[in-house]
Structures are given as C-alpha cells and as structure tokens.
Amino acid sequence: VEDKYAMVQMLAAAIKSVYASVYYRDSKAYMTATQNVIDQEKMAVILQEVVGNAHGNHYYPNISGVLRSLNYYPIGNEKAEEGIAALALGLGKYIVDGGQTLRVSPYHPRQVLQTSELHACLRDTQNQFYALDLNQVSNDFKVDDGFNILKLGIKEAEKEQTLNFIASTYDPNDNIIRDGLYPGGRKLITFKGVLQQGVFPLPQLMQLAMKNGADAMRRPVEIEFACNINPDRTGEFCLLQIRPIVDSKQMLEEDITRIDGNRCLLRSHNSLGHGISEDVTDVVYVKMSDSYNAAENPQIVDEVDTINRKFLESR
C-alpha cells in the first residue's frame, strides 16, 4: 500500500482484531479451562516485518524453520543436547500448523531420515507451502489469522524460480533422485544445497543460534527463523522469535519397557512426547470400529466439543 494514511488505518484495524480475539469463543474456552480471569489478562502487540521476497502476487521466504535446542527423539548418533530443526519452504505458519517438514539435526545435516531412502523421500517431503497473497489488501481483518495466506503447490514455487539450492529432482526414468534442479521430474524439498553442499552455512548458523540462545536464557530454547537465499549464493538468516522450553516435567527417567503391560491403561508406539498432567479428572474415549469413515470426523469433533463443554460447565 503506497498511501501511508491507508497503511496506518489497516495497521490499526489489525491491532484491534488481535485485541478482539480475546473475546472469541475459543479464547474464552481456553481461559475457562486454564482458570484464568480475562479481566486480569494483559496483552502487548508486537509489529514485525515479514521475512521474504515478492514473487509475482506471492510473498514468502525460501526457508522457514523452528529450531529446538533439546531433541527428545534423537536417532542414530544424534544427541538430545544437539537440538533439532524443522525446515520448510515458505511461511513458517506451515510448520506451526503441522505441515510436512524436513527434520534435521544442525550437527548432523547429512543424516536426514526422510531423504535417506527413495520411497521415503517421495512420501515424506513437503508438497505444499504458504505464501502471503499480495492481492489480498483489506481492512476487513478476520478471526482466522491466515485469511490472507495462500496454500500453494511446489510447482508454483518452481514457476517462480524459488527452489534454487533447496530442491532435488526425481528422475522417473532412472528411478533416482538428483541433487539440484533438472528439467522434468518431480521437485522434492530436500534442502541439500544448504545442508550438505555448503551453498549457505545454515547448519552452522543454527548451531550458533541455539548456543547463544540457550546461554542467554540459561535453559533450552525454541527459535523461529527464516532465510532468503539469493541466486549468487548469498542470503539472510533472520531470527523471528526465541522462547524458553519449559521441560521440567518432560524428562523421562523411567525405563518404560520394564512396565508390565497388564498395568497399562493404554499403550501406543506413536506418541507426542513425555509429560505429566496431574489435574486430569475426566477422559473422553472415542471408540473406533471397522466401519469407521474419515468423512464422519467433523461430526465426531462436534460431539466431543459438546462433551467438553459439559465438563467445563459442571466445574
């Protein structure tokens, strides 16, 4: 927006929308669940420049990442204190929303499980990304923080020539993956150029950010960052956020393999991590049957939401 007065009006509308979000139903439900009083809450709004470049009507960085200085699930010769990063093309909201990212240890950039085998690379690498829609300029800010964000396919980034140094090419004729961009073939987001070929010192920058961040806060940290990579192999590494990881209750000292299976309420080989919750009094169990249909998920969500509300109201 070239009109500075119009820009100020848009900025004011955006800030009002942030404050107004406190009074939405989901926000109030969170406040009730955490036993906080909304009148005692305080909020500050931080203005921050979006890292990236304009590509036609889209605006996004070449790389976004979330970096944790503590890795709860090291593989191979990785160590927990060496940290872990989740990397993606485009805006970092894609990572926060649980999109398919590349998991890599800054100290072991050549040891990437997702790209270690052909079928895994084809199956487990990013196939979409987020970008700001430069055509969406409006004072009508929405409840959804992604109302002006587009979800695009990797082919769109290929057209906009933003895959240099971060993509590889699948050759279906030889059934192999070639590092770099080649005509034809599916493009895979592997970040080989910046992780393994020294195009941009991303592993070293992540190591430095983790060390300085953890030293400054005197505890493990989580860092959000973004990078712009230029065709001449120069680039910018931008720190966006840094916050401490509260992990006092997340360290598991017990060998769970020694626990008698008959004493388990439930067991899973896929979990979200360690944690201790001492205030759980009600459990909602959704029973799955052979006739389960994923199309019924929205209805199940509504039913669970109704049950949760009854629990909150009965407190």
Predicted regions: what is each one?
Residues 1-315:
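Nucleotide/phosphate-binding sheet-loop regions of phosphoryl- and nucleotidyl-transfer enzymes
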